[in-house]
Amino acid sequence: MQIKALSVSEINHYIKRIMINDPILSNVYIKGEISNYKLHSSGHIYFTLKDEKSRVSSVMFKTNTEQLKFLPEEGMQVLCRGYISLYERGGLYQFYVDHMEAAGVGALYLAYQQLKEKLEKQGYFDGKFKKEIPLIPRKIAVVTSPTGAAVRDIISVIKRRFPHVEIYLFPVLVQGDRAAPSIARAVELLNLFGGIDVAIIGRGGGSIEELWPFNEETVAEAIFSSQVPIISAVGHETDFTIADFVADLRAPTPSVAAERVVPDVKEVVERLNTLKDRLNKTLVKSIDAKRNQLGIIKSNYYFKNPLNMIYDRQQHLDILMKDLTRNINVKNSLYSNNVHRLGERLNSVSPLSVFSRGYALAENKKGERIKTISNVKLKESITVQLIDGQLSCEVTNILKEDKLVGKNQI
């Protein structure tokens, strides 16, 4: 009897067909903990699902990872849907995941928390980046659904409070998968529109799924990058979205946003009237003060006789000139006396004064002064400086210790 043997590839392919055609393995939900999580450069993620006793290798391809509302992490409990099949080349069976959500905590809530933490670390919520809302805007952009109650509330409140402001509606989708790109694009357009002073972005309340576009990163980036100040007005008072944290001002509802974006024209008029009255009173008070000051000046003696003031100043100037001249003469006399005394002191220590008393100064040929008889020799030529000239002399005798030393004496 001849035994028919299968190749490794054939047996793996056969097992794979069995798995694919199995009604349970072809569409199965598995709950477990993520382990050995790896995000490949291709966008695929590879991980292991495990519990206390077992584990299964798993993969989720890029086309499915792009639909995730949160970022899977090591140790996270998840509920995955997919199918079991064999990786023929390695002979290993794998769980091919096409849907994943966080177990216990909703996937949307987890995604919300993750994005909030990420943007907060990047400074998106920092107050130093918040732009000031203009006090009285002229042009207001409204980014919302053109058919919802929010747009009617916003326009109604703005027109009631400040009728002359211009409102520009940028219609967008406010829920669904296409809403986030629609909102982000509208923010870009209102910045390109030109002349917009402030924008309101919002919608009425709803579930977390309905409000989710305002939790998308693309919307947060558009709001953060906007040069036009943004007021967010999403949902009800208790609803906080990522857009609320990034926006320059958060309003709990669209109606409140409309109230905050413009002042009440009646209050503005009252305020202007109050300022007008205050300005008039201040001007009257200032004019009265200046009038009194002018009256005092006009009653002044010199104002009535201006030439007398000139004469008085001239007389005062003459007195000052006399005092100045006298002081200069006194100083000159003092300095002259000082110079004379210093000159006398200088003359007293001058060599010339020594000469005038009959003394002389002797030097050898080198110009060295002769201070003692030990500095000269017999027959040495020396120069003697007198008060009125010099003498060239030859030493013929040296008197030492009261004795005359002659040429024959040593």
Curated annotation (Swiss-Prot):
It is found in: Cytoplasm. InterPro entries: Exonuc_VII_L, Exonuc_VII_lsu_C, OB-fold_nuc-bd_dom. This is Exodeoxyribonuclease 7 large subunit. GO terms for cellular component: cytoplasm; exodeoxyribonuclease VII complex. GO terms for biological process: DNA catabolic process. PANTHER family: EXODEOXYRIBONUCLEASE 7 LARGE SUBUNIT. GO terms for molecular function: exodeoxyribonuclease VII activity; nucleic acid binding. The gene is xseA. It catalyses: Exonucleolytic cleavage in either 5'- to 3'- or 3'- to 5'-direction to yield nucleoside 5'-phosphates. Keywords: Cytoplasm, Exonuclease, Hydrolase, Nuclease. It comes from the Bacteria. Its EC number is 3.1.11.6.
